[in-house]
Structures are given as C-alpha cells and as structure tokens.
Amino acid sequence: MFTLKKTLLLLYFLGTISISLCKQERDADEDDGRKMTEEEVKRSIITMTKEAKLPQSWKQIACRLYNTC
C-alpha cells in the first residue's frame, strides 16, 4: 500500500511540474506573439503565392501533366 501511495504521489508531482512548465512556455509564446497587421497579412499572402509558382495558363498545366515541356 505504501509503494502505491509513493507512486501516485510521484506521478502527481511530475504531472504538476509538467503542467506548470507548459503554462510557462505558453505564456512566453503569448508575450512574443503579437497580432499581425493587415499589411503583414497581405505581404505573407503575396509571398506564399509567389513561392507556389502556380502555372500561368492551361498550356503549362497540360505540359506538366503530360511531360511535354
């Protein structure tokens, strides 16, 4: 019975320590994280579309599908 109590007590303390560490980490992330402005959102959307390198026409799509490029 005593070993069971020790084990449960140990698990309880390890759980509370891990929860407190997670909370500290989350609080640190919230301090750093600020709201993005509209301009930053627009910039990120533009850069994502530029990096995607989408085909400009149906000919390019067909070319890539059939490997005729």
Swiss-Prot record:
The lineage of its organism: Eukaryota, Metazoa, Chordata, Craniata, Vertebrata. Keywords: Amphibian defense peptide, Antibiotic, Antimicrobial, Cleavage on pair of basic residues, Cytolysis, Disulfide bond, Hemolysis, Secreted, Signal. Antimicrobial peptide. Has activity against the Gram-positive bacterium S.aureus ATCC2592 (MIC=15 ug/ml), the Gram-negative bacteria E.coli ATCC25922 (MIC=60 ug/ml), B.dysenteriae (MIC=60 ug/ml), H.pylori NTCT11637 (MIC=30 ug/ml), and the fungus C.albicans ATCC2002 (MIC=30 ug/ml). Has little hemolytic activity on rabbit red blood cells. This is Pleurain-A2. Disulfide bonds join 63-69. Coiled coil: none annotated. Expressed by the skin glands. It comes from Nidirana pleuraden (Yunnan pond frog). Belongs to the frog skin active peptide (FSAP) family. Pleurain subfamily. GO terms for biological process: defense response to bacterium; killing of cells of another organism. Residues 23-43 form a propeptide. One of its GO terms (cellular component) is extracellular region. Residues 1-22 form the signal peptide. The keyword Calcium does not apply. It is found in: Secreted.
